[in-house]
Amino acid sequence: MKIVLLGPPGAGKGTQAKSISNRYSIPHISTGDIFRKNISENTPLGMEARSYMDKGLLVPDEVTINMVKDRLQEEDCLSGYLLDGFPRTVAQAEALNEFLENRNEQLDTALLIDVPSEFILDRMTGRRVCTSCGGSFHIKFNPPTIDGKCNLCGSDIVQRKDDTVETVKERIDVYDKQTQPLIEFYKSKNLLSMVDGTKAIDQVFEDICKLLGEQ
């Protein structure tokens, strides 16, 4: 089973990816992990990527695509895989499509965990973390017993910079602009599947399993 996982920041992709990987015994492949591995091992592609990153530049599609292609040819991918964070653009999706066609393979589905922007804002801006022990809370869904204090150690809990309204809105905006063409691309290929990401974690996973059973 070959799956591309799509969804906005705060949609719970990481949680669902882990569950899918465990249930179907396929590797969860994230572009972040691929980049870190190539860079830490000083592979030719890793060194090329680092040369761009050190200058504060975006790594070209060609480098990212070749890293992903190399990863998909490893032995643990023979029975399938779950791609998380790739493709990010239509050009990358087309490159993946071509790679699969050349191997007489095909993608089973592009799975979109759909969550409205207002819900993401509520979910992400309400997160709080303890300054001492790292305990996590949510002012709406998992509030501390004493306002502003950690249940575990009594230290202050704070909002991370990544979780401010301005930052979250910016991330959602970037996602929308980047991913909408990708969603249309997979729709046109009849490969797009959608689940409602506002449901409880277990219910979202149950819906995903039902969808994957239809592939």
From Swiss-Prot:
Describe the reaction catalysed, as an equation.
Answer: AMP + ATP = 2 ADP
Q: Name one GO cellular component term.
A: cytoplasm
Indicate yes or no for the key word Nucleotide-binding.
yes
Pfam families named among the record's database cross-references: ADK, ADK_lid
Q: In which pathway does it act?
A: Purine metabolism; AMP biosynthesis via salvage pathway; AMP from ADP: step 1/1
Task: Tell me the residue numbers annotated for binding AMP.
Answer: T31, R36, L57, L58, V59, G85, F86, P87, R88, Q92, R160, R171
Q: Which GO terms describe its molecular function?
A: adenylate kinase activity; ATP binding; zinc ion binding
Annotated residues that bind ATP are located at G10, A11, G12, K13, G14, T15, R127, S136, F137, K199
Q: Which PROSITE patterns match?
A: ADENYLATE_KINASE
**Where is this chain's protein located in or outside the cell?**
Cytoplasm
Task: State the EC number(s).
Answer: 2.7.4.3
A GO biological process held by the record: AMP salvage
Alphabetically list the UniProt keywords: ATP-binding, Cytoplasm, Kinase, Metal-binding, Nucleotide biosynthesis, Nucleotide-binding, Transferase, Zinc
Q: Where is this region: NMP?
A: 30-59
- Keyword Kinase assigned to the entry: answer is yes
Start and end residues of each stretch annotated as LID:
126-163
Residues the record lists as binding Zn(2+): C130, C133, C150, C153
The UniProt entry's sequence similarity note says: Belongs to the adenylate kinase family.
Q: Please give the subunit comment from the record.
A: Monomer.
* Reported function: Catalyzes the reversible transfer of the terminal phosphate group between ATP and AMP. Plays an important role in cellular energy homeostasis and in adenine nucleotide metabolism.
Query: According to its record, what is known about the domains?
Result: Consists of three domains, a large central CORE domain and two small peripheral domains, NMPbind and LID, which undergo movements during catalysis. The LID domain closes over the site of phosphoryl transfer upon ATP binding. Assembling and dissambling the active center during each catalytic cycle provides an effective means to prevent ATP hydrolysis. Some bacteria have evolved a zinc-coordinating structure that stabilizes the LID domain.
What name has this protein been given in UniProt?
Adenylate kinase
Originating species: Clostridium botulinum (strain Eklund 17B / Type B)
Q: Which gene encodes it?
A: adk
